[in-house]
Amino acid sequence: MSVFTPLERSTLEAFLAPYDLGRLRDFRGIAEGSENSNFFVSLEHGEFVLTLVERGPVQDLPFFIELLDVLHEDGLPVPYALRTRDGEALRRLEGKPALLQPRLAGRHERQPNAHHCQEVGDLLGHLHAATRGRILERPSDRGLPWMLEQGANLAPRLPEQARALLAPALAEIAALDAERPALPRANLHADLFRDNVLFDGPHLAGLIDFYNACSGWMLYDLAITLNDWCSNADGSLDPARARALLAAYANRRPFTALEAEHWPSMLRVACVRFWLSRLIAAEAFAGQDVLIHDPAEFEMRLAQRQNVEIHLPFAL
């Protein structure tokens, strides 16, 4: 179970008291998390999720709180930070920054079809539309410079075939970092995977885990999302799912010609980002009782993205 900071019941009860949500009925750790400690918390007046933030600078947490407030106010189904009776949203528990949020209904969709992907494309388009007019600035701590640094560090330890795949991808990232093309920007979720979306029946009911959120190119966020939701087991893209997601997104925001030009490379960049972070996690948590996602999944996806046949619709 990926709970890095276990909690005693009495400690949790004392923490929850200022929210005036009634007595604690039950709580349990959430196994799916791979970076933070998360708990389902059942209180007299509702169901909630408690997050202890284990990674990242504490000074960035007000950004996440403000972003979720903006998205919640725009009607997106996101968890927002609850306030205590004194108006506090960000607190500390067992020495870690802690947030209490409403628990959203629904379940993860492990085998999405075109309908699920259409819902996700519409959701991402809504998220970008809600923030592009007033972007809350936060650079990603796993952006292009991070990829170049970590790629160089990891490459010598990779098998020859993996190094041969990574090297041209890093060269492409270096060129993109130098060019910094004027692609449209907004706030990004930057981790919109299947395990961060909740469906209640056929309807998308929630988007969670914003702790990688940042500001940046909307196209990059779209590439991250499509790589997970529309990939087959061998890493190739499923055309029906991919086109459903892209069409729904385009209904919210038409693409530009520059985005169409950079689309294939952005899909590859998004693969590299998660291949590297998974390799790092696999080394750091080897032998521990922590959920580790398979790095090979994104190695396969990067190999499949060398020739991209799914293009952006309605490019202007």
From Swiss-Prot:
Catalysed transformations (reactions) = L-homoserine + ATP = O-phospho-L-homoserine + ADP + H(+)
Any single GO BP term: threonine biosynthetic process
Q: What CDD domains does the database record attribute to this sequence?
A: HomoserineK_II
The pathway where this protein functions is:
Amino-acid biosynthesis; L-threonine biosynthesis; L-threonine from L-aspartate: step 4/5
Pfam families with a match to the protein in the record: APH
The Swiss-Prot or TrEMBL record describes its family as follows: Belongs to the pseudomonas-type ThrB family.
Q: What is this protein called?
A: Homoserine kinase
Q: List the source organism.
A: Pseudomonas aeruginosa (strain UCBPP-PA14)
